[in-house]
Amino acid sequence: MSAIKLDGNLYRDEIFEDLKGRVNSLREKGIVPGLATVLVGDDPASHAYVRMKHKDCEIVGVKSIRKDLPADVTQEELLAVIDDLNADPECTGYIVQLPLPKHLDENAVLERIDPAKDADGLHPVNLGKLVLNEPAPLPCTPNGAIHLLRRFGVELDGKKVVVIGRGVTVGRPIGLMLTRRSENSTVTLCHTGTRDLAAETREADVIVAAAGKAHMLTADMVKQGAAILDVGVSRVDGKLLGDVHPDVWDVAGAVSPNPGGVGPLTRAFLIRNVVERAERA
């Protein structure tokens, strides 16, 4: 195992120290930032993610509000909870934990969120602002991934980046963010319709694996010294696995572990979105 470990936990702790000071300053002014989560159903992974988010709130000093709903909640009942959070002055920002059960209209739920309270940065208005390069809450996982690369000195300017996966939470927005002038990367977005994935990845300086297919990126698909971000998650035989095969560590120059790589920064930038909105209020 020769690759540098892109340890998200180390960087998360640095971000949390900064946020603690900012939250204390807000509290001195009588402002208490509040993060709410909306969780539908009993998926163990989703419950684990939400627990970690609320633990992070406790560490930083942000008020946490939790809305847990049964798996058979109706669309109308879920939208009513969204409306309540939109109107709640104690809720600075919130997220709806995805994915939702299949009987619920995910897009309609996301559209119902007040864009100003969209802590995940996934509301259509905020994604549109990302396209236009206007200020808005940024999607947390792509933002965390890019900051992780920066923190460890991985060069992006002019580099070829291959993104595997075209989902709305990672693949599509990270492609937009990497082509901003601040990153200035050349991005190839690969997906199930890509004819020769390995031919694309072998040319990449940086690979973002966000397909949700366990161990699909193998060493023979990676050029020597490339930086690899493992963002995808799959459940196999009761275990959570990333998209990157362990043999990639012997070829790559830097790899984010999964868990412990991008995930901690996803949560850190979620809280930062909430704190920044409180600072603007």
From Swiss-Prot:
GO-annotated biological processes: L-histidine biosynthetic process; methionine biosynthetic process; purine nucleotide biosynthetic process; tetrahydrofolate interconversion
Family, as annotated: Belongs to the tetrahydrofolate dehydrogenase/cyclohydrolase family.
Quaternary data: Homodimer.
Pathway given in the UniProt record: One-carbon metabolism; tetrahydrofolate interconversion
GO cellular component, one term: cytosol
Name listed for the protein in its UniProt record: Bifunctional protein FolD
Catalyzed reactions: (6R)-5,10-methylene-5,6,7,8-tetrahydrofolate + NADP(+) = (6R)-5,10-methenyltetrahydrofolate + NADPH; (6R)-5,10-methenyltetrahydrofolate + H2O = (6R)-10-formyltetrahydrofolate + H(+)
Function of the protein: Catalyzes the oxidation of 5,10-methylenetetrahydrofolate to 5,10-methenyltetrahydrofolate and then the hydrolysis of 5,10-methenyltetrahydrofolate to 10-formyltetrahydrofolate.
Binding site for NADP(+): 165-167, 192, 233
UniProt-listed Enzyme Commission number(s): 1.5.1.5, 3.5.4.9
Species in which this protein is naturally found: Corynebacterium diphtheriae (strain ATCC 700971 / NCTC 13129 / Biotype gravis)
InterPro entries named among the record's database cross-references: Aminoacid_DH-like_N_sf, NAD(P)-bd_dom_sf, THF_DH/CycHdrlase, THF_DH/CycHdrlase_cat_dom, THF_DH/CycHdrlase_NAD-bd_dom
Gene Ontology MF terms in the entry: methenyltetrahydrofolate cyclohydrolase activity; methylenetetrahydrofolate dehydrogenase (NADP+) activity
Keywords: Amino-acid biosynthesis, Histidine biosynthesis, Hydrolase, Methionine biosynthesis, Multifunctional enzyme, NADP, One-carbon metabolism, Oxidoreductase, Purine biosynthesis
Stored Gene3D superfamilies: Leucine Dehydrogenase, chain A, domain 1 (3.40.50.10860), NAD(P)-binding Rossmann-like Domain (3.40.50.720)
PANTHER family, A to Z: C-1-TETRAHYDROFOLATE SYNTHASE, CYTOPLASMIC, C-1-TETRAHYDROFOLATE SYNTHASE, CYTOPLASMIC-RELATED
